[in-house]
């Protein structure tokens, strides 16, 4: 699930880091974990600048730390709702009626706003995140949800160069549906406050779309006054060859909110100034993240820069994709739809039983792969994955596929 930055053991590198060394030998810092929302350490802002803010996405000047991907997205949704209502009120204080009705879960204090999400999405397992998740039924079953719009995510045909016209038509169809849903939900009295999307739908089957699709979707959000939330919980951290997958879109103004977790060691979300909560405690929980993780992240980022690991990912990713294409050509009755960015790659099998069999045999040979979607194998190596690792992977996979002839 793309949660590892580096898989090599680097205890000496980490433990000798001066800031981390001071932290490790300070028992008080371990035992008395600070409630960051009200009592952050004096140096906490400095540590944010050294870690999370040093890799902030384009246009993002603020970061809110959290603990995990779900609470990152859940609170990002809340930020978008608060921002939307503040706009509607003209940034005036809430009325007495709004304050009273919110206590009994009624409008106008609890407004009928919505978040637009996409089929195949996965954003988390808390209530709001589940309402925007449409890929794994087991997580949603028996849980009440919200009446929020769900748009189709493009289903691209591969190889891309052979289906340029068809894929452009498919993306146009999905974008048209997005606009129709925004208008429809506004007419229903449930206006769309925000749009949330993954740069690559991971759990849903490693589904991709073109930079043009995301650019036009960003414009639709702006046109209709919706916040645009890019969920980089799985794709962030460099595995696509860029630190943030949305950088591949080439946009100067890619998002209003970018959420993260997994590889970043801590959770949270970046946001524009205008999405800053207008009052204390509106975005709040007990811990609001963990300052120790910022120390670890700071050193991890130093290693990434020093060893040019994003360049390594680009080289290894190219070799991996080429190798998967070759296997697909050799075993067309088993494999199809090779795709990926960097080492964030995937390939489809002929059915789920075959996929599961291949993965089991691979695991028994020392190769651990993931599954997603209906019949997809996904590859999520760490950033230290080198070309010789690629060849080892491909050799093991080739041996297994030969047994399926």
Pin down the residues of each PLM region.
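Conserved N-terminal phosphate-binding loop of PLP-dependent enzymes in the Aspartate aminotransferase
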Residues: 1-405
């Amino acid at each position: 699930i793309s949660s590892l930055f580096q898989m090599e053991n680097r205890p000496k590198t980490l433990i000798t880091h001066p800031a981390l060394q001071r932290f490790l030998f300070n028992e008080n810092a371990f035992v008395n974990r600070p409630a960051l929302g009200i009592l952050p350490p004096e140096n906490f802002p400095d540590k944010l600048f050294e870690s999370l803010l040093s890799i902030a996405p384009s246009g993002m000047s603020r970061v809110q730390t959290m603990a995990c991907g779900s609470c990152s997205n859940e609170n990002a949704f809340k930020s978008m709702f608060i921002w939307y209502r503040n706009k509607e009120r003209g940034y005036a204080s809430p009325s007495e009626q709004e304050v009273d009705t919110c206590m009994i879960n009624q409008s106008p204090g609890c407004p009928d706003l919505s978040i637009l999400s996409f089929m195949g999405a996965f954003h988390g397992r808390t209530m709001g995140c589940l309402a925007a998740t449409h890929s794994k039924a087991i997580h949603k079953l028996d849980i009440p949800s919200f009446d929020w719009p769900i748009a189709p995510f493009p289903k691209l045909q591969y190889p891309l160069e052979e289906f340029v016209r068809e894929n452009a038509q498919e993306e146009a169809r999905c974008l048209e549906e997005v606009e129709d849903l925004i208008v429809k939900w506004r007419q229903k009295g449930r206006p769309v406050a925000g749009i949330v999307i993954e740069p690559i739908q991971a759990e849903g089957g490693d589904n991709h779309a073109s930079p043009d699709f995301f650019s036009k979707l960003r414009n639709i959000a702006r046109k209709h006054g919706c916040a645009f939330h890019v969920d980089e919980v799985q794709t962030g951290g460099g595995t696509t060859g860029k630190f943030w997958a949305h950088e591949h879109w080439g946009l100067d103004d890619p998002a209003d909110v970018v959420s993260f977790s997994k590889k970043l060691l801590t959770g949270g979300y970046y946001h524009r100034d205008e999405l800053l909560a207008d009052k204390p405690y509106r975005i709040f929980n007990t811990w609001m993240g963990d300052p120790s993780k910022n120390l670890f992240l700071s050193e991890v980022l130093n290693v990434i820069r020093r060893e040019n690991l994003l360049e390594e990912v680009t080289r290894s990713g190219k070799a991996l994709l080429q190798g998967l294409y070759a296997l697909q050509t050799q075993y067309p009755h088993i494999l199809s739809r090779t795709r990926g960015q960097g080492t964030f790659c995937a390939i489809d099998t002929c059915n789920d039983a075959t996929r599961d069999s291949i993965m089991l045999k691979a695991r028994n040979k020392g190769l651990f792969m993931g599954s997603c979607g209906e019949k997809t194998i996904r590859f999520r190596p760490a950033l230290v994955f080198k070309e010789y690792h690629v060849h080892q992977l491909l050799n093991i996979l080739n041996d297994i596929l030969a047994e399926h002839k």
